[in-house]
C-alpha cells in the first residue's frame, strides 16, 4: 500500500520524532517540491552549490566522486540513501562533494534552504535531528582514523576507499591506475599489485581493467584480518 505524505515525512531523518500536528504545520508552511526521475537522470553534480535539502523518497541512487586531480573515480551504489549531504547545507564548504544520479526510476522531495532556516530550524526536534546528522558524519570520519591500528598495504587500500565513500554499504567501483593508487597510499606499485591480488584471491574484490570492484565493503572490512606486510 502506498504511503501517505505524513508517513513519508516521518520516515525522513530530519522529521523523526515529530507529532502528526507538527508534520501538518510543516506541510502548511513549507513548500515541498517533488520531482520524478528516469533511470540515469542526474540529481545534483559534484561542486554544485547545496541550496536545500533533497530527500530520496523512491528509487536507488548512485554517487560518483571524481578526484580534483583526475587520479581516480569512485562510484557507489546507495540503495538506502535517504537524504543527499544535509551536512553541506551549512559551514565553510556548501557544495556537493560528488554527483548523484538514479540507477532506477525515482522521486525526490526538496526543501529550499530559506524554508529550512525560517520554519524547520524553529522546531527543537528538527534542530536536534540536524545536529545528530552532522555529528554522525564527523564521528564516522574520526572512527576511520582508528580503523586499523597498524596499516598493512591491504588495510591502506581499504581505508583509502572508505575515506572517499558516503556509506560502508553497497557496491564500490574504483577506476584508478595502479601507479596512482600506490602514490596516494605511499606504497610501491609492486606492493599494491600484490595486495590487490591477495584481496581478490580471498574474494574481497574483483580486479578489472583500470580498477576494481568491491561488492560489500562492510563485510570486507569486518572480515579483514592482518596480512603479512610486503614492504
Task: List PLM regions with ranges.
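Cyclic-nucleotide recognition modules
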Residues: 30, 74-132
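Short phosphate-coordinating micro-motif centered on Lys-Gly-acidic
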Residues: 39-48
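Polybasic "coupling" helices that flank or enter modular domains
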Residues: 121-189
Amino acid at each position: 500500500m502506498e504511503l501517505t505524505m505524513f508517513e513519508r515525512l516521518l520516515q525522513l531523518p530530519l522529521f523523526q520524532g515529530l507529532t502528526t500536528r507538527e508534520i501538518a504545520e510543516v506541510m502548511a508552511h513549507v513548500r515541498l517540491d517533488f520531482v520524478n526521475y528516469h533511470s540515469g537522470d542526474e540529481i545534483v553534480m559534484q561542486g554544485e552549490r547545496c541550496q536545500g535539502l533533497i530527500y530520496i523518497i523512491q528509487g536507488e541512487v548512485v554517487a560518483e566522486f571524481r578526484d580534483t586531480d583526475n587520479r581516480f573515480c569512485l562510484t557507489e551504489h546507495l540503495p538506502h540513501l535517504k537524504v543527499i549531504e544535509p551536512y553541506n547545507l551549512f559551514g565553510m564548504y556548501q557544495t556537493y562533494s560528488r554527483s548523484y544520479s538514479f540507477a532506477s526510476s525515482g522521486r525526490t522531495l526538496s526543501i529550499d534552504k530559506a524554508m529550512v532556516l525560517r520554519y524547520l530550524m524553529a522546531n527543537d526536534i528538527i534542530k536536534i535531528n540536524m545536529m545528530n546528522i552532522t555529528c554522525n558524519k564527523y564521528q564516522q570520519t574520526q572512527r576511520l582514523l582508528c580503523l586499523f591500528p597498524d596499516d598493512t598495504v591491504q588495510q591502506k587500500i581499504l581505508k583509502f576507499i572508505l575515506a572517499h565513500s558516503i556509506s560502508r554499504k553497497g557496491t564500490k567501483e574504483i577506476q584508478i591506475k595502479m601507479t596512482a593508487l600506490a602514490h596516494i597510499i605511499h606504497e610501491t606499485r609492486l606492493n599494491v599489485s600484490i595486495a590487490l591480488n591477495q584481496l581478490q584471491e580471498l574474494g574481497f574484490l574483483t580486479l578489472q581493467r583500470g580498477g576494481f570492484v568491491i561488492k560489500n565493503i562492510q563485510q570486507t572490512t569486518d572480515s579483514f584480518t592482518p596480512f603479512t606486510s610486503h614492504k
